[in-house]
């Protein structure tokens, strides 16, 4: 009996030891991985020999130096060497330092990430302690769901911004771009849209933003939505690799919540700085420019990022993406803006001249388009908006004529109506960031037009600030 007990004890001990080994080597931190050595060092990248057969584009590697282990991404693979861009600037790199393959970069989001601010590596930067990790690790370089497995986009929602809810209404699962030059009000409009109450979760990627604005945006703008929001931050002084990764990390977090059935709002400010980061990395890898200094990889990565947003499969939720595009020199046909416009489901154009007049948000209702507007409008609303756009167009095209005194009342009924009603429409569209979101934009507009028709036009100004 004693012998049998000893054999059972030895067997159980061996099994426990074997299980421990399996668990240990299943962990990527302990697994045996191929490695190489640093061969050359240049500003923004370094080359490694001995890894060409073992890595793929986009794989992460760990560079071991005298100060610790630092991450890098493989951006070019050649027969005898690979080119690696370090993730963080200032990493100390020496010739013959050891470099180990890590594979795809993965994160494990959970609901506990809500209310937190993290960097592009999914590390907390808000001083609130460590992040709890989920059960499923997701690659940030994931692909979009197959098109035929996705639900249709059907349900409209209220943003609370009258200029958008009337002229360019949105649907859950839509991807919308906000196009504007610098200093026109993109971030301000995004902050107004972030307060929409139609979403279970909000994920925000702040890419290349000024450091002083990050805390203001998160704490002042989100308000009650802060508890259901995750902010991913890569400021302008961080490396191009981190600025490139931030939107990918954000959309991966949004995918986690969508797959659980949540309706998610994804805000990226801005995709242009994401494109600039890709350009910096591609230039370091030796990729030639093809369009105004942008390499081909920019126009490959943009659709990969944007197509990951949208509706999920049956039973899943949606990702409604609202992204900002900074147009260089107010040129709305620059390569990044033109490429993004062709991918997105609509675009809001912010006009600098409207901002200079003090009309906020400076949304140009004639140039802004929502490709899914018909799913959000009722038939009567669609007819009304078509009529409103006609009046606004008539009002704007005759502005010079009226300035030189060439307008005579009674000669053109449409122009007479435009002159009476368009200023009222413009007044209704004005909203300041601190105002409560509009509950029903069409009702506000109808009330203002009725007041103007009764000769009480000043009362229309009182609409601003009503919820």
Curated annotation (Swiss-Prot):
One of its GO terms (cellular component) is bacterial-type flagellum. It comes from the Bacteria. Its EC number is 7.1.2.2. InterPro entries: AAA+_ATPase, ATPase_a/bsu_AS, ATPase_alpha/beta_chains, ATPase_F1/V1/A1_a/bsu_nucl-bd, ATPase_T3SS_FliI/YscN, FliI_clade3, P-loop_NTPase, T3SS_ATPase_C. It is an enzyme of class 7 (translocase). CDD domains: ATPase_flagellum-secretory_path_III (cd01136). This is Flagellum-specific ATP synthase. GO terms for biological process: bacterial-type flagellum organization; protein secretion by the type III secretion system. Keywords: ATP synthesis, ATP-binding, Bacterial flagellum biogenesis, Bacterial flagellum protein export, Cytoplasm, Hydrogen ion transport, Ion transport, Nucleotide-binding, Protein transport, Translocase, Transport. One of its GO terms (molecular function) is ATP hydrolysis activity. Probable catalytic subunit of a protein translocase for flagellum-specific export, or a proton translocase involved in local circuits at the flagellum. Belongs to the ATPase alpha/beta chains family. The keyword Transport applies. It comes from Rhizobium meliloti (strain 1021) (Ensifer meliloti). ATP binds at residues 180-187. It is found in: Cytoplasm. It catalyses: ATP + H2O + 4 H(+)(in) = ADP + phosphate + 5 H(+)(out).
């Amino acid at each position: 009996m004693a012998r049998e007990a000893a054999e059972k004890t030895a067997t159980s001990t061996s099994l426990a030891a074997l299980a421990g080994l399996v668990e240990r080597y299943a962990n990527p931190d302990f697994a045996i991985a191929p490695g190489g050595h640093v061969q050359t060092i240049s500003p923004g990248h370094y080359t490694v020999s001995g890894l060409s057969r073992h890595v793929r584009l986009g794989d992460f590697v760990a560079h071991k130096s005298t100060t610790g282990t630092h991450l890098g991404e493989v951006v070019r693979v050649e027969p005898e060497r690979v080119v690696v861009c370090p993730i963080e600037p200032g990493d100390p790199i020496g010739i013959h330092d050891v470099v180990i393959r890590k594979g795809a970069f993965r994160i494990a989001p959970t609901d506990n990430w809500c209310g937190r601010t993290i960097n592009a590596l999914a590390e907390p930067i808000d001083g609130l302690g460590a992040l709890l990790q989920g059960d499923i690790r997701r690659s940030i370089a994931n692909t979009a769901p197959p098109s035929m497995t996705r639900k249709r986009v059907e349900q409209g929602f209220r943003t609370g911004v009258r200029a958008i809810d009337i002229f360019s209404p949105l649907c859950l699962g839509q991807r919308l771009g906000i196009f504007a030059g610098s200093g026109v009000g993109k971030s301000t409009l995004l902050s107004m849209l972030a307060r929409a109450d139609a979403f279970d979760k909000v994920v925000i990627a702040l890419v290349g933003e000024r450091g002083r604005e990050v805390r203001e945006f998160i704490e002042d703008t989100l308000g009650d939505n802060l508890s259901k929001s995750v902010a991913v931050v890569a400021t302008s002084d961080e490396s191009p690799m981190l600025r490139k990764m931030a939107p990918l990390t954000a959309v991966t977090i949004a995918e986690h919540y969508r797959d659980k059935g949540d309706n998610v709002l994804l805000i990226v400010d801005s995709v242009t700085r994401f494109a600039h980061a890709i350009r910096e990395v591609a230039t370091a890898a030796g990729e030639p420019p093809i369009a105004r200094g942008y390499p081909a990889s920019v126009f490959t990565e943009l659709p990969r990022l944007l197509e990951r947003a949208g509706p999920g499969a049956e039973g899943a939720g949606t990702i409604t993406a609202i992204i900002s595009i900074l147009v260089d020199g107010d040129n709305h046909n620059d390569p990044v803006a033109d490429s993004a416009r062709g991918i997105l489901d609509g675009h809001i154009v912010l006009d600098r001249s409207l901002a200079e007049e003090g009309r906020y948000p400076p949304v140009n209702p004639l140039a802004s388009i929502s490709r899914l507007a018909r799913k959000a409008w009722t038939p009567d609303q669609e007819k009304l908006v078509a009529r409103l756009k006609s009046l606004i167009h008539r009002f704007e095209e005759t502005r010079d004529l009226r300035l030189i005194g060439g307008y005579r009342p009674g000669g053109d009924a449409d122009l007479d109506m435009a002159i009476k009603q368009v200023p009222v429409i413009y007044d209704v569209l004005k909203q300041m960031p601190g105002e409560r979101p509009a509950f029903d934009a069409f009702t506000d507009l109808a009330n203002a037009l009725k007041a103007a028709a009764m000769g009480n036009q000043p009362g229309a100004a009182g609409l601003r600030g009503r919820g």
